[in-house]
Structures are given as structure tokens and as C-alpha cells.
Amino acid sequence: MQKARIKLASTNVRSLEEVANQIRQIAERTGVRMSGPIPLPTKRIRIVTRKSPDGEGSATFDRWELRIHKRLIDIEADERAMRQIMRIRVPEDVTIEIELIS
């Protein structure tokens, strides 16, 4: 049987966990085997900018950081389960990738 590998990514952990829990509930209802959600390493993007626009004065900096959280879910690619997964309402800050693996 084919598997579906679902990759979730978001800057908001709560909305990411909500979507992962919805997928878990669908798997339990339809009776398909599922592994995950497996937390992948969080990507931290750091940007340091100079506060002073003209270069004069003391060198003070602003530090900004963006964290991207990721989860990986493997699920059997049952037609009924996949249709329900496609109907999940996904928040704007969560991206989903679904890949079929044989």
C-alpha cells in the first residue's frame, strides 16, 4: 500500500499542533496506520540590523529572529482518509506538503 508523507511548517507552534492533531484524529477515525507527528529541527533565521540609519553615533544593533517549526507525518494513503485530510481548514501561517511514497 502507498504511503503519504505530510510535511507541516509554520512560525506558530499552536496552529501547527492543531493541524497535526486534526490529521491524527482522521487517522484514528478511518483506522489507517500513522507514524508521527515527528518534530523536525526548528530553523532559526536571524537578522541583525544597525539602529542608526546614517552610520553616525555609537554602533547599536537590533536583533530579529524568525523560528520555523516543522513536523513530519507518515500515513497510509487510504482514499477515504486522504479526502478528509484534503478538507482540513488550514490556517494561513501553516504550509502543508503531501508526497506519495510507494
UniProtKB/Swiss-Prot annotation:
Briefly, what is this protein's role?
Involved in the binding of tRNA to the ribosomes.
The record's listing under InterPro entries reads: Ribosomal_uS10, Ribosomal_uS10_CS, Ribosomal_uS10_dom, Ribosomal_uS10_dom_sf, Ribosomal_uS10_euk/arc
- What does UniProt give as GO cellular component? small ribosomal subunit
Q: Which HAMAP family match?
A: Ribosomal_uS10
GO BP of this protein: translation
A molecular function annotated in GO for this UniProt entry is: structural constituent of ribosome
Self-association and partners: Part of the 30S ribosomal subunit.
Name the chain's protein: Small ribosomal subunit protein uS10
Q: Which stretches are transmembrane?
A: none
Please state which protein family the record places this protein in: Belongs to the universal ribosomal protein uS10 family.
Keywords, ordered alphabetically:
Ribonucleoprotein, Ribosomal protein
Q: Which SUPFAM superfamilies match?
A: Ribosomal protein S10
